[in-house]
Amino acid sequence: MRALEESYDVVVVGAGPAGSMSSYNASKNGAKTLLIEKAQEIGTPVRCAEAIPRIESFGINPSSEFIRSYIKGAYLVAPNGKKITVKGGKTDGYVVERKIFDKFLAIRSAKEGTKIAVKSRVTGLEKTEEGYNVFVNHLGKEYTVKTKLVIAADGVESTISEYAGLKSKKNHNEVCSCAEYEMTNVKLLDNNMMEFYFGEICPKGYIWLFPKGDTVNVGIGIIEGSKKAIEYLDDFLSNPLLEGRLKNAVPVEFKVGGDPVGGPIKKTFKDNLIVVGDAAGHVSPLTGGGISLAMDCGLIAGEVCAKSISSKNYSEEFLSQYETRWKEKHYKFLMNDLKYKTILQKLNDNELNAIADSIPENLEEVDVGKLAIKIVKKAPSLLKYFKELI
């Protein structure tokens, strides 16, 4: 049971949502697939805020097994306390227990025939005529696994893509530093609404409060600052904007991590290899959210790899259809969010307040172009930021 076989059609590195969905679709479509996870337990350590849009389109029913809260919208809070309420769209979804959700996705993949190796670290790749030799330390024993295809789903710190000569996001301006408490005894504005706070309290980022059943995820993501992310977060806990709603809060878990918010990497495929999820920059540069996007790109990756196996064509030319397909669905969204993030990072507190005072307090949808016109009409000095959006 512990030993790895000598060869597989597809080796997926990383058992997060991107990796598990990749292996699921590869196995489902007939490829002999190995899913490798460095942690001894899939889903740990948790490094994200755990909010996701609806998942029914993936053929997954929202289950109380992993869903902790249903989300119907969000409050966007300006430095002066002005609240903008947004409902529907991508704010409609869930907060999940990632420890359980990630394991659920891996189990779903295993039921399609995927072999899973936990507490396993890829220590190197060697290109061969047939594909790759993957060097794996599995439960303390060294293995060399032959494979025709590798899917790099090993996260923001991806080493697999770099072993293969594809750049992953590691520039400090492209990775958001995140810290989060899971807390109990928190009073929310609404138990089914997320809260986001912006401004100098969180340089070039935002602070979030996400309902999670009996607890709340209270976190921060910043690009730069004079202090560590955790120091900004600790300062926020007593911020007057909260009106004492966290004064009795008690942390039950602490999480840290990095989020690749610089947009997708330049190229996500080459001969015998595909990059997906955080490793590929499949993350909204604006919000830092990427679970749903990673899942969808993972499905595409798995399907393309299975087709590659059945056609016995593992070339860069054949695998390019993976990038073509995910870009058709998601590239415009990612690049727009990168543009919006760049604008947001230039705004000071007074300018953020001016924006909040220029738009309706209740938004059923977010049309950035229309909002930009409203903002500039009321605050013409902001035209320098929004002229390319109008």
Curated annotation (Swiss-Prot):
Q: What reaction does this enzyme carry out catalytically?
A: a 2,3-bis-O-phytanyl-sn-glycerol 1-phospholipid + 8 A = a 2,3-bis-O-(geranylgeranyl)-sn-glycerol 1-phospholipid + 8 AH2; 2,3-bis-O-(phytanyl)-sn-glycerol 1-phosphate + 8 A = 2,3-bis-O-(geranylgeranyl)-sn-glycerol 1-phosphate + 8 AH2; CDP-2,3-bis-O-(geranylgeranyl)-sn-glycerol + 8 AH2 = CDP-2,3-bis-O-(phytanyl)-sn-glycerol + 8 A; archaetidylserine + 8 AH2 = 2,3-bis-O-phytanyl-sn-glycero-3-phospho-L-serine + 8 A
Name any one Pfam family assigned in the record: GGR_cat
**Record-annotated residues binding FAD?**
18, 37, 48-49, 51, 98, 122, 278, 290-291
User: What is one GO biological process annotated to this record?
Assistant: glycerophospholipid biosynthetic process
- What Gene Ontology molecular-function terms does this entry list? flavin adenine dinucleotide binding; geranylgeranyl reductase activity; oxidoreductase activity, acting on the CH-CH group of donors, NAD or NADP as acceptor
What does UniProt give as the signal peptide span? none
Q: In which pathway does it act?
A: Membrane lipid metabolism; glycerophospholipid metabolism
Keywords of the record, alphabetical order, are: FAD, Flavoprotein, Lipid biosynthesis, Lipid metabolism, Oxidoreductase, Phospholipid biosynthesis, Phospholipid metabolism
Binding site residues for a 2,3-bis-O-(geranylgeranyl)-sn-glycerol 1-phospholipid: 368
> Which family is it part of?
Belongs to the geranylgeranyl reductase family. DGGGPL reductase subfamily.
| Family annotation (HAMAP family) | DGGGPL_reductase
Record-given protein name? Digeranylgeranylglycerophospholipid reductase
Species the sequence originates in = Methanococcus vannielii (strain ATCC 35089 / DSM 1224 / JCM 13029 / OCM 148 / SB)
Give the source lineage, highest ranks first. Archaea, Methanobacteriati, Methanobacteriota, Methanomada group, Methanococci
